[in-house]
Amino acid sequence: MAIIRSKRYRAAIEKVDGKKSYPLAEAITLLKSLPPAKFDQTVTLSFRLGVDPRQSDQMVRGTCPLPHGSGKTVRVLVFATGVAATAAREAGAEYVGFEDLIKKCQEGFQDFDVAIATPAAMSEVRKLGKVLGPRGLMPNPKTGTVTEDTAKAVKEVKAGRVEFKLDKNGNVAVPVGKFSFETAALSENGAAVIEAVVKARPSTAKGAFIENVTLSATMLPGMRVDPTPFLKA
């Protein structure tokens, strides 16, 4: 069945050269010149990586603080007690607790975007693997969401730190902001994301790590981005 595209989408795709790899700043300028949607679209960088997602030693995962934030309101849940719990509340976490929150999550509570836990809390939080795991919400030391410094973690997430993880097809997609952002802000966020993904290259990866990069917005066509300036010699 053929996909029916909107008039706006068809007009946008005529402006994009599908054979060209654009410098990041040029790609963002072009994206911003395309017809906007009726809502503030999320702008995303998608990476096709030269790794085998079936191999555990080729997993690509990490975090990236966006210099200009993500434009998204992030709801944070923290599993902690005592001083760490108090610090999380003062830093702005929406939900803070321990056994009460574990029970609440087991009962189906899902009104949060990021979960953080202290190392001491993880022995119990691991019981939520089947609940939080499928949604990508299980706290993990590699993404800075298992930590004693709950205040720092909450502030970083609220400020726009994004997480990324390789999917089963060897792709990584990372939001870099909103369509309403200034071009310079999107460019700086995008550069930070590309650099973070490059640094996350597994030591076991062979050959070209970043095979291609695509910039897109929710309702607009993607365009290829040249990652060469961000690659180490």
Question: Language-model segments: what does each one mean?
Answer:
Residues 3-17:
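Generic N-terminal amphipathic, Lys/Arg-enriched alpha-helix
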Residues 4, 225-233:
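Short, charged, intrinsically disordered terminal tails
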Residues 22-86, 107, 113:
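Translation machinery proteins
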Residues 27, 88, 133, 215:
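Residue-level signature of catalytic and energy-coupling elements of molecular machines
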Residues 39-43, 200-212:
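Flexible, glycine/charged-enriched surface loops at secondary-structure junctions
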Residues 47, 80, 118-119, 176-178, ...:
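Flexible glycine-/small-residue-rich
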Residues 93-200:
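Long, charge-patterned amphipathic alpha-helical coiled-coil/hairpin "stalk" segments used as oligomerization
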